Each structure stands twice: as structure tokens, then as C-alpha cells.
Amino acid sequence: MLLLLAEYLQQFYKGFAVFQYLTLRGILGVLTALSLALCLGPWMIRTLQNRQIGQSVRNDGPQSHLSKSGTPTMGGALILSAIGISTLLWADLRNHYVWVVLLVTLAFGAIGWVDDYRKVIEKNSRGLPSRWKYFWQSVFGLGAAIFLYMTAQSPVETTLLIPMLKDVSIPLGIGFVVLTYFVIVGSSNAVNLTDGLDGLAIMPTVMVGGALGIFCYLSGNVKFAEYLLIPYVPGAGELIVFCGALIGAGLGFLWFNTYPAQVFMGDVGALALGAALGTIAVIVRQEIVLFIMGGVFVMETLSVVIQVASFKLTGRRVFRMAPIHHHFELKGWPEPRVIVRFWIITVILVLIGLATLKLR
């Protein structure tokens, strides 16, 4: 929005041309979203407390979690508001990738909001029934996948890139739609499963989002893309503004979500952020790198799959409790130790993901 204004004002003062720089608008996106989250956070927490919108805690979980009962939830609305406002202010709204990522994020956030509303406000422990949750996730995921497939400007935009192998890629054709669907929906649910401890999901999301922002910037620049042997995706660089907003909003939310949390993001935040990461990774053709960098999300998801499959097949549980962060808690790890160690793992995995830019 402000970019369009700056372009108009350039005829009166050439200094406004500085807003053409993606890096500047990315930084402004971070600072704007961070400021919004920090300023609106206390008000939102008070509002949630006054309306008694608090988290319910399972009795069969770690005993240390019982003290969390009643902590305000649905704080993900703060993250989405900060991301949305910052992106609309600083991104080029003529760029269709910006709208795809923003609309997917808000759509999955709406699914999470309905789920949280039914659980917290209507006191329905089931929330939004799983079949309806996955139905709407499928609708929005497939919608985004089909749109990206139909608007692809070159074959490389629908080709699966294999990291570290410069001469190996797989043309997907219509299979691009299937892969994109699974990446978006899978990423959304993986982040949601990870969101079980104070700050556990948001910091890895920020780190992975920041790394994807680097991929967006490089993929959107033809010279960098050619030098690094990554797909050149015209217009993808503009997503650095969204990624910047995600970083700022995430850090602002972490201010209130760090142990002991004053607010939880709820499904409204977790489902939306996961879908955003998946959509961005698809656009810049880095699905496998997302799998690497988001290893914590993958580990959490696999722990649930393994636990359920093992119990159904053998009647035994592999872990003391799933997702796996609860397993470590029940082993005696203090919650902050679990959180920080998962953060450290994410730092390592993100560095490995970034290293694939040169390892070819």
C-alpha cells in the first residue's frame, strides 16, 4: 500500500524511490509487525482474560501443566493481525504471491479460530470435528495449489528441486497440485502439533520463516538464482516482506508467550503459521528444504503417527506421551529445557537448510 504511495510521490521527491528496495521494506515489515504485537499484546491479553477465554488442560498430561489452566488462548489472532497489517502496508499489493500467502494464512487461521471458539467459548471439548477441519483445510490447500499451478510462468515453477544435486530435478506436471496440497496441509498440522509448550512452536516458526525469506529474496533475483543454481521465480522476492512481518509478529508474540506464558496462540495461530510456511516453500520450490529446516515439526508429527500406529497394532505405546515434547517432560525434563533444546535443534537444521544453497 505504502509502496504505491511512494511511487506516486517520487514525481515530487526522488528520495521516495528508497522504498523500492526489498530489503528495506522487509526490515520495515519486521519492525512494524513487532511494534504492533508488543503494543497490542497487553490489551489482547486483558481482553481475553476479561472474557474468560482460557486454555483447558488435559488431566492425563504432565502435572506441571495443570497450573496453565485458564491461561488466555487464541492469541494467534494477535500474530495474524500484526502480519496482515504489516504486509498490507509494505508489500507490493500487485504481486499475486503476496495475496496467495496472505489469504492462505488467514483462511487456515479462520479454521483454527472456529476450532478454538467451539472449544473455549462453547465449551465443546471436540472443537471443530476433525472431518470438517480437514475438509476446509483441503478446500483452501487445493485452492492454493490449483491457483499456483495455473499461474506458473515456466516449467521450473512446477518442478521438484532436489537439494545438493544440481542436475537432478523432477518435473511434476499436475502432480504439483498433489504435492502442494500435502505440503500446505501437512505443514499446518505439524506446527499445530508442536504448539504444546510455552514458546515451543513460535520460535522455530520464526527461524524457518526467516530462512525462507532468504530463499525468497534469492529466488526472486535472476542473478542470484543463476549463480546458486536455484529456480528463478519472478516476483517471489516480494515475499520477504511477508516473512519479515512473520518474524516481527512472532518475536512480539514470544514476548508474552515465553515461559511461563501469559497467552497461548491456539489453533488460530498454529494452523495459520504452518500453512504460511508450506505455501512459501512451495512458491520458491524448497519443499524438501522445508522438511529439513522444520525437522522439529516433522519429529513431533512422526511421534504422533508412530504412537497411534503402535498402539493400534500392538496395544503398546512407544512414547510415554505424544507429541514427543510431552515424552521428555514425563521423563523428568523441565519444560524450559525441552523448549530451548528444541530451539537449538531448529537452529542447527535451519543452518543445514541454508547450507544447501552452496552444496551443489
UniProtKB/Swiss-Prot annotation:
The protein's Enzyme Commission number: 2.7.8.13
Enzyme class: transferase
Residue ranges crossing the lipid bilayer per the database entry: 25-45, 73-93, 97-117, 132-152, 168-188, 199-219, 236-256, 263-283, 288-308, 338-358
GO CC, one annotated term: plasma membrane
Pathway this chain belongs to: Cell wall biogenesis; peptidoglycan biosynthesis
Signal peptide start and end residues: none
Membrane topology value: Multi-pass membrane protein
Record keywords: Cell cycle, Cell division, Cell inner membrane, Cell membrane, Cell shape, Cell wall biogenesis/degradation, Magnesium, Membrane, Metal-binding, Peptidoglycan synthesis, Transferase, Transmembrane, Transmembrane helix
Cofactor(s) it depends on: Mg(2+)
One GO process term, biological-process aspect: peptidoglycan biosynthetic process
HAMAP family: MraY
Family: Belongs to the glycosyltransferase 4 family. MraY subfamily.
Name recorded for this polypeptide: Phospho-N-acetylmuramoyl-pentapeptide-transferase
